[in-house]
């Protein structure tokens, strides 16, 4: 079955009593197990059935089946946020004394979690600047390797195939944050990655109306992640959010095609504009990761970053004069968004680490929406003319 068909039909069950095509919203915190023996068996994991919505909900379960199919995974888990996803993964897979490696930069919230919270559990955090640096220098004590396929916000390409090669040298578990590409453009598990995760808030949801996280992988790994996420940390997604995320995923291919088309046109325009110092978009032949990404993914994503001369003040002038682009963090919405990462999404990083990661004061990140590309270009042209 092709991806577009799976995005609509996978995990969807026509209700046998009513014939309803849409998954109902089961707004129930607890579920009856009807007799004591059935309750005993459900709590022991010996019989199927729902107990309590923190552990699972019928609306959520159908969404998880759809996401597992789209990822090519044994199973998927949806949780309250992308940060809930990454924290559950890390706590499930690493123990005190282990080492966790990552390829930077990461999303600022993930970076802060690893360095300020997770490290307090007695876990060593080691950063690498590229997949090749990881391959050459990975340490034997490494238990988990975390990376983003396109780094946020510098859009550096990290090759999952190289990460897998490096991790297998020391027996480490690989975790790929594929938020920027989605399973429509890349299915990391097919390249040997162990666990894939997303901020479901972004492209998967696609409408800017939910907060969600997604994790997918093998039964063996997901059993531990599910236990930590739902039973120990207690970060389930609500049924309303699950309902909306399932609806959003159905249109993922259509929306991603529009994001990609617009991002390429916007990047081409910006690359030719004299006021722009640098354009960062993997779809440009000038991007150092252009060929690599083209070899393992089926598209270059909907994110474009630029650098201007003049630091925060000049970036603010551009941002404040945009009319269609909305100044806001997050990404993957229908609307085009723009932000200054150094002062927003990555402000929690210490300055030295932030600058070393390429998140400088000249950088602006655009999430290109699904509006008409000509209108977006006109908006950018008018704002750039005021610099």
Mark where each language-model region is.
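N-terminal "arm"/small-domain region of PLP-dependent enzymes with the aminotransferase-like
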Residues: 1-57, 65
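Positively charged, small/polar-rich N-terminal and surface patches that mediate targeting and assembly
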Residues: 2-4, 10-12, 58, 216, ...
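Conserved PLP-enzyme active-site core in the AAT-like
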Residues: 7-9, 13-16, 75-275, 280, ...
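Glycine-rich beta-alpha junction loops
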Residues: 12-14, 27-33, 180, 202, ...
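Conserved N-terminal alpha-helix of the aminotransferase class I/II PLP-enzyme fold
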Residues: 35-84, 109-116
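PLP-dependent enzyme catalytic core of the Aspartate aminotransferase-like
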Residues: 115, 124-126, 320, 336-387
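Short, well-ordered beta-strand elements within core beta-sheets of diverse protein domains
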Residues: 244-254, 302-309, 365-369
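Conserved small-domain helix->loop->beta segment predominantly found in fold-type I
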Residues: 264-335, 349-355
